Design a protein with these regions (language model features):
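Conserved, mostly hydrophobic/aromatic
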Residues: 43, 68, 90, 121, ...
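Rossmann-like NAD(P)H-binding beta-loop-alpha module
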Residues: 143-144, 150, 164-181
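C-terminal active-site-proximal or functional interface alpha/beta core segments in diverse enzymes
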Residues: 213-215, 223-471
């Protein structure tokens, strides 16, 4: 089989942790189900990269960790102790943040909000990101029904453009179109308790030129609002960047080449039901969906990307100069890029089975819900750790599917076959790397009353020894 591995980029601290199987054995004792292991020191390291960049560029620290990325209480404590803020997307996330110690000064409430969510946010004076005009009207109604403090709001725009290049956000169900700004301004005039301080745009784009063009449009809107006697001074550029997840991006490019070649020649793609991750040949013999699948992984450094945005030339000067001259602050909401490389998931082999056409599969103690496969398709090869060394099969190579323990025919985390140097045996460990961002607990559930996940913290003590304990 012509197999192309997709190797994960692994942080040195995690490499050290998994090199000692005693650490894995200790973690495995905590639960019979999936085990998510997170590393708060790596999370703190990622935070400091952004803080250092902000300090270097004379920017105030408007860095809001996106809570939805990971439910870990430990991550919230690290964020709080390192003086960054938090963005919450639900009432329960707000309660979690408040109970951790965050206050109105460092909480932003975003995404569509229920009446209960709005009520609690207003009681605690949290910054509220306005998702639509009806939400703004709900805030006005709630304010009139009780004793509330001034409400600081952020207006989220979804259709920014640029005067010197074509820039447009994709159609989305979230946020507000620019043509509705006059109606919003009228509501602000009529309700003086609404304090318009922030402008936000949500543009999921990985070309810094386009992001910079949108940022310039946002700056223009802020400057125009001053003519209407408003005084917003902070622009939230969201974030939406993942950073490098692969040891070598060429692994991914070669794998896409493999899928395209096998599909074009009608060969076996070595994927479940020969699906090839949507890559297919059209009636005109054109390879379709390749470009879409390719975008899953990028060779991208988030700090470098942010630096490129600020140094981008527009209107004959760069974005950073415009922000400083206008006395505007820059807010970002990193989630994925803060939790990247901060953890992995440990699974146990519970069996294996033979399939048709000499195919085989290894079965692990988890299911598709445990790694949020509806949110993310997992492509990266896992790491196989033998529980007991077995030298009898080292001369074999195994290309197996990984099955889960749910009673569904689509309960397969990875559609592609996985290469194993040694045959996986019962009690062996299968490690999925970099699962701390939107993967480990984003949509986890205990289907058919299976053992649900447990989250563990791995942190070095003063003796440079890893200590493992529940989150």
């Amino acid at each position: 089989m012509n197999y192309q591995k997709i190797r994960p980029l692994i942080h040195n601290q995690i490499k050290e942790f998994i090199s000692d199987t005693n650490n894995l054995d200790i973690a495995a004792y905590f639960s019979q189900g999936p085990i998510h292991i997170i590393f708060p020191d790596i999370f703190q390291e990622n935070i400091h990269k952004f803080l250092s960049f902000y300090k270097l560029n004379w920017l105030n620290d408007n860095i809001y960790f996106a809570h939805k990325t990971n439910k870990s209480h430990c991550f919230l404590e690290v964020a709080l102790n390192n003086n960054i803020s938090i963005d919450v997307a639900s009432k329960n996330e707000l309660i979690h943040s408040l109970s951790t110690g965050f206050t109105w000064k460092n909480i932003s409430c975003s995404w569509p909000k229920s009446q209960d969510f709005l009520f609690l946010a207003m009681k605690h004076k949290c910054l509220i990101s306005i998702d639509n005009i009806d939400e703004l009207k709900s805030i006005i109604d709630i304010y009139s029904s009780g004793n509330f403090p001034e409400v600081e709001i952020l207006i989220r725009i979804n259709d920014l453009s640029s005067s010197d290049r074509i820039v447009s956000s994709k159609n989305t169900k979230f946020w507000i179109s620019q043509h509705l700004l006059p109606e919003i301004y009228n509501l602000l005039y009529e309700n003086k308790f609404l304090n318009f301080k922030w402008l936000h745009f949500h543009f999921d784009e990985h070309q810094f030129e386009l992001k910079a063009g949108s940022l310039q449009n946002a700056i223009d809107i802020l400057q125009q609002s001053y003519e209407l006697w408003f005084a917003p001074n902070i622009i939230d550029i969201w974030w939406g960047l993942r950073g490098n997840e692969l040891l070598d991006i060429s692994d991914w490019k070669k794998y896409i080449d493999f899928l395209a070649e096998t599909k074009k020649n009608n060969w076996d793609t070595h994927t479940w039901w020969n699906s090839a991750y949507w890559v297919h040949v059209s009636q005109k013999w054109v390879i379709e969906w390749r470009e879409i699948v390719e975008k899953r992984f990028r060779e991208l450094d988030p700090i470098e990307f942010l630096n490129n945005i600020l140094n981008f030339q527009t209107h004959s000067w760069n974005i950073w100069d415009t922000l400083i001259d206008s006395m505007f602050d820059l807010m970002i909401e990193p989630g994925y890029s803060l939790t990247l490389w901060c953890g992995f998931t440990l699974l146990k082999v519970i069996g294996y089975k033979d399939l048709w056409n000499q195919n085989s599969a290894v079965i692990v103690n988890a299911n598709i819900l445990n790694l949020s496969s509806k949110m993310w398709k997992y492509f990266v090869d896992p790491i196989h750790i033998q529980h007991k060394k077995n030298n009898n099969n080292t001369h074999w190579e195994f290309y197996w599917y990984i099955f889960w323990n749910l009673c569904r025919d689509d309960d397969i985390l990875m559609q592609k076959k996985v290469y194993f140097k040694n045959k996986p045996e019962i009690w062996d460990y299968i490690l999925f790397m970099n699962t701390s961002s939107y993967i480990s607990d984003f949509e986890d559930g205990s289907a058919i009353s299976q053992e649900t996940w447990i989250k563990l913290i791995a942190k070095k003590d003063n003796n440079n020894t890893f200590k493992i304990y529940p989150d």
